[in-house]
């Protein structure tokens, strides 16, 4: 029996006027798999993540989650934990931001909020207004937001940028725990190949809107050569 894919990106194209930003892109992700999306600035990694999350519609092709087209079934993306430019109310505390989000999702999450703030080492700052947070603290609070409800698929855009070494390790361990302990697939974009090498199972590379590589991490030498050829082409 073949692998069952939880998420399928099928021949997705994104076009703005006459400009093709993303060209006929396909990718499949299995349960419990950690996939890194890499590429240079302007490689439309975030564009692809926005399409997968249902924030932007593809010009052609489709994204399926659990066999359902997310454009036709937008409510299914409620199972996604997403960290793409997290949004906060800066004038209230970290705790209040999470409580407000839990009210919007109609779930009482007092215990979960405490667990997440402790896990991300923000508990000592739970009463502090978000406007007083550093960038790294806001990233960690964003992680709390996307894990507040039960997550079936985790999507992170450049999660390690701006983090100190402790923050990086915290994010990496969270990703590993989600995939290996809860069998939740994780898709994250990154520029840092060291971070990619450390935690992911598979590398997918985009360059100039086209998929250039889709390879298991065990073939590291092959994908490193491919990256170098693409960068210096």
Each predicted region: which residue ranges?
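The feature captures the beta-strand-to-loop junction immediately N-terminal to the Walker
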Residues: 38-40
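Conserved ABC ATPase "signature" region
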Residues: 99, 110-125
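Catalytic Walker B motif of ABC-type/P-loop ATPase nucleotide-binding domains
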Residues: 154-158
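Helix-to-loop junction immediately C-terminal to a conserved catalytic motif
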Residues: 53
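ABC transporter nucleotide-binding domain
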Residues: 172-233
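Conserved ABC transporter NBD signature motif
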Residues: 61-76
